Amino acid sequence: MHSLQSFLFLLLLGYGVFAAPTSPQAQSQGRSFKVERIKRGNSIHGPTALRRAYRKFGIVPTTFGVDLSDFVPFNTTSISGTAANLVTDVQEPEQTGAVSAQSVQNDAAFVSPVTIGGQKIVMNFDTGSADFWVMNTELPASAQVGHTVFDPSKSSTFKKMEGATFEIKYGDSSFANGGVGTDTVDIGGATVTGQAIGIPTSVSNSFVEDTYSNGLVGLGFSSLNTVQPQQQKTFFDNIADSLDKPVMTAHLKSDGVGEYEFGIIDQTKYQGDMINVTVDSSGGFWQFQSAHYKVGDGPIQTIQNNAVAIADTGTSLMLLDDTVVNAYYAQVKGAQYASSAGGYIYPCNTELPNLAVAVGAKHLATVPGTFLDFAEVGINKTTGQTVCFGGIQSNQGTSMQILGDVFLKAFFVVFDLRGPSIGLASPK
């Protein structure tokens, strides 16, 4: 159990401490359901996680630092496993309606089995997007290798949406696009009939190579959905009215079993008070004010730019304003920016300070330094020390900060469509 002191919430003002087709139909037994997550023990690669985050939000790196001659990167071929073989690890206790959600590459990504038209597909739950799309048999055969693909022809409930298309395109020209259909989707025993699903006929190599996941379940706001000519609702929006409460909770612990849970806020999963902050959903993200930060025992500082943040389960790292990143690594012994790694690195035996970031206008949420040590990345040629890649990296001056799984797994998090709002509490 985490100690309450490890997950402090500071009151900023007083510095007090407290921790278009037929409308989709939803069916949810018990009016709540959960998607469990089980830890895996594979290796991770920090620069890859950072590149994926940059690709997702169209961020172009501009920072330069030490080059490849300063350290020897580890060979990333040690990363093994595919989304196809993750399905065999799934457990489905009938009495709870629970399904497994695996953390792959030591928390580099969280994936979960989803049933589409009777076919079980491992996918990524992503609060930073709003499209439900899946790798499928309409893609070229070469793009299907290593993936578990959805076959529309084998689903008796699949219906093509004539004239409808979707397109996800990122700043570096990564993409997925194609047609759209509807089908019955089951997640943890909760079923939506007529869920809109992107059926790409073309995807970029970045999606082909990501064999840990076969698609995305977008859990952002439906205004972010890319389906044309008429936007479609997310799975969360479609299931919301059938739930006891229109909420999703994320309990993404790094040291054991955790879960996503819909329809209920389980008070046995957290301790102490929960803070709730207003979300600005106008851009389609779970976005809130985040204008302050605090490194270790230092003073509370103000961020002049990028004073908003989003909570994003589809991103591994914390991508923060350069002011925060530079101030943080100034307190990390031996830290330096490495252009070959794409971010800040430091000797792995360095003890990292805690980092507190503002959540809303009144509160700071503290992430323990142990959570911010993301991955080993190589060997220092001069000292022979193992070098690590930080879980905090630059957002390269973009308009928002991105709080990914490095942040989220430190808390019990509530995504609440009422308001909307986000709640944070210290997890048990």
UniProtKB/Swiss-Prot annotation:
GO terms for biological process: proteolysis. The active site is at residues 126, 312. Residues 110-425 form the Peptidase A1 domain. One of its GO terms (cellular component) is extracellular region. This is Putative aspergillopepsin A-like aspartic endopeptidase AFUA_2G15950. The keyword Repeat does not apply. Disulfide bonds: none annotated. Pfam families: Asp. InterPro entries: Aspartic_peptidase_A1, Aspartic_peptidase_AS, Aspergillopepsin-like_cat_dom, PEPTIDASE_A1, Peptidase_aspartic_dom_sf. Residues 20-90 form a propeptide. Belongs to the peptidase A1 family. Glycans are attached at residues 276, 380. Keywords: Aspartyl protease, Glycoprotein, Hydrolase, Protease, Secreted, Signal, Zymogen. GO terms for molecular function: aspartic-type endopeptidase activity. It comes from the Eukaryota. Residues 1-19 form the signal peptide. The lineage of its organism: Eukaryota, Fungi, Dikarya, Ascomycota, Pezizomycotina. PANTHER family: ASPARTIC ENDOPEPTIDASE, PUTATIVE (AFU_ORTHOLOGUE AFUA_2G15950)-RELATED (PTHR47966:SF23), BETA-SITE APP-CLEAVING ENZYME, ISOFORM A-RELATED (PTHR47966). It is found in: Secreted. It is an enzyme of class 3 (hydrolase). Its main location: secreted. The keyword Oxidoreductase does not apply.
